[in-house]
Amino acid sequence: MGKLGFGQLWALIAETLAPGKGIPLHAHENMEIISIPLSGTLRHRDSRGATHIIAPGDIHVLSAGLGVTHWEYNDSPNEPAHYLQAWIRPKSRMTPTRYAQGTMDDCDGSFCLIAAPGGCDSVVEIDQDAFVSLARLPRGTEMQYSKYGDANGLHVFVIDGRLDIGRKELADGTGLSLIGQESPVLKVLAPSRVLCIEVPL
C-alpha cells in the first residue's frame, strides 16, 4: 500500500515504527497529510520548532502548502507505533503551512466523519472537497456508506477485519477504489475497522 493516484487521493500509507525509531528529516509541500494513529504514540517535530504528539483517538492534519521540513518518530521507548497516513492534493497551492488536530468521536457501529472541508467540532479541516470517515463495525453488520458527493470517488480500506463489497472480499490491509454515483453496501464478515476516503476525481 502506497501511492494510489486515485483522483485527489495521492497516497494511503501504513507505517509501523519501532520503539524510539522514526522517519528522518524530510520535506512536504502542497499536500494535505492526515495522520491516524492506530497504536502507540507518534511525535511530529518540524524545522520551525513546532511539536505535536498524537495517540489513538486523535487525528492530525498537516497542510503543507508553501512547504515544511519535519521528522516523525515513535515517542515510546518500549512500544511500537502503528499509524495510517492519507495524502490528499489540496484545492489551493502554496498556501501557508498549518496544522490541525482533533479527537475523534466514538465510531462504534457506524461511520464518523473525521476530516472534511470546513471542519467542525471533532472533524478536522482539510483544503479539499474530500471526506474521511472511520468506523468500527461488528460482525454481521450490513450498512450502506452514504456519499457526500455523487461525483466523488470512494476508496474503502480495511484496517483490520474482513468485509464484502459487491461480492468483492476485503481483509486486513486491503482496499478497493470505487467510481460511480452509487453508495456501496458493506457486509461485515468479521469485526472490522474501516476507513473511507471520498475524493474528487
Please place each PLM-identified region on the residue numbering.
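Ligand-binding loop in jelly-roll beta-barrel domains
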Residues: 49, 64-94, 180-201
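Short acidic-glycine-tyrosine-enriched beta hairpin
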Residues: 48-63, 106-109, 165-188
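A short glycine-rich, His/Asp/Glu-containing loop-to-beta-strand
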Residues: 1-27, 31-32, 83, 104-146
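Extended, compositionally biased flexible segments
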Residues: 1-75
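Intrinsically disordered terminal extensions flanking catalytic oxygenase cores
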Residues: 153-154, 160, 174-179, 192, ...
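Short histidine-centered beta-strand/loop micro-motifs
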Residues: 21-28, 45-46, 71-75, 123-126, ...
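Glycine- and acidic-residue-biased ligand/ion/polar-headgroup-sensing regions
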Residues: 29-48, 56-59, 139, 145-166, ...
